[in-house]
């Protein structure tokens, strides 16, 4: 999972604290796997991917899960002074968007030159809305969510009030899916801060999972498409305002419930199941969730997936067998590419603004 803070927080308690760290790293790996799974469905089969129930299920909650975990790990950053905070977050989240965005355009243009197609890397394209509002949108969304929460914690007003104010403000920001992402980020923060709230979530975990499953039954193609065209629906008056509001609320709630469901599932089984050598080795990938998100997007989604197709395979064998296998291959290959990048300090500094 893309933990935008990229910080692992150890809790007190000996072996138990290690297991808690392990299960949240594994949760990040799980979410990374989901986003790759969704991209494989989207790009490697010639069909209407929105009609695919597996795709719609993944996309109902996986980005909310990313953001919830980011909020969970954000508390140490919230204690920083203003200038170091914004410098750190810009370096961590905005710089890679620029560095990898330019790299992707140059890589794409190298291929376009060979294929005699129009070049993508031009000053107008670099500064276009398409680039800034789409490429690596989640990193930019995470930066905005961090900034909103940070500014809220710096106010002199009571906690419940700044929470309400920032939630309201988030609904007015039209880019980077902030209206849906910030509530998940904030909930992750609150769950980490409040033991009583976390206890409530644990107590009602079965109810949360059941509600998510019920909502999935009504998460149709029409609902998915409508929830992703809210701005157009409002501008073109294609739907009554009340219906638009309910559709927006539905998307928000199903995302929160889905993220919470897997959050509490990993929380519940972590202590007893995840404390094995195999899971510990797998959890290492969770420490590179930001890099996995970026590198798999550039290398596979932007480049290799354009030359691969499994359309010759039947629909359900593709979805139930091919997609999970290909997704795992992409996940582990991406991790190896990241490992290679970090072997070259200059390259890692250039692409990620850090070294390990």
Indicate where each model-derived feature is located.
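Alpha-helical transmembrane segments and their immediate juxtamembrane cytosolic regions
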Residues: 2-356
């Amino acid at each position: 999972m893309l933990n935008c803070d990229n910080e692992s927080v150890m809790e007190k308690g000996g072996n138990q604290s290690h297991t808690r760290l392990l299960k949240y790293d594994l949760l990040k790996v799980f979410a990374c796997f989901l986003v790759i799974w969704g991209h494989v469905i989207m790009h490697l089969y010639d069909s209407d991917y929105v009609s695919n129930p597996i795709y719609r299920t993944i996309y109902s909650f996986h980005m909310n899960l990313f953001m919830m975990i980011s909020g969970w790990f954000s508390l140490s950053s919230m204690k920083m002074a203003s200038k170091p905070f914004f410098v750190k977050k810009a370096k961590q989240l905005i710089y890679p968007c620029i560095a990898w965005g330019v790299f992707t355009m140059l890589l794409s243009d190298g291929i376009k030159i060979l294929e005699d197609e129009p070049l993508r890397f031009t000053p107008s394209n670099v500064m276009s809305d398409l680039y800034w509002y789409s490429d690596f949108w989640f990193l930019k969304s995470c930066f905005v969510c961090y900034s909103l929460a940070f500014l809220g914690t710096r106010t002199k007003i009571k906690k419940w009030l700044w929470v309400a104010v920032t939630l309201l403000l988030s609904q007015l920001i039209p880019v980077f899916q902030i209206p849906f992402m910030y509530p998940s980020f904030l909930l992750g923060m609150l769950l980490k801060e409040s033991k009583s709230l976390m206890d409530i979530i644990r107590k009602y975990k079965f109810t949360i999972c059941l509600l998510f499953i019920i909502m999935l039954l009504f998460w149709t193609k029409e609902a998915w498409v409508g929830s992703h065209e809210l701005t157009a629906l409002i501008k073109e008056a294609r739907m009554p305002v009340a219906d638009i509001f309910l559709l927006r609320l539905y998307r928000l709630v199903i995302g929160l419930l889905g993220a919470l469901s897997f959050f509490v599932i990993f929380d519940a089984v972590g202590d007893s199941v995840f404390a094995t050598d195999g899971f510990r080795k797998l959890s290492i990938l969770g420490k590179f969730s930001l890099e996995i998100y970026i590198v798999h997007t550039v290398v596979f989604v932007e480049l290799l997936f354009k030359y691969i197709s499994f359309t010759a395979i039947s629909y359900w064998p593709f979805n139930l067998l091919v997609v999970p296998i290909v997704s795992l291959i992409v996940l582990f290959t991406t991790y190896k590419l990241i490992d290679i990048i970090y072997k070259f300090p200059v390259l890692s500094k250039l692409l990620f603004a850090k070294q390990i």
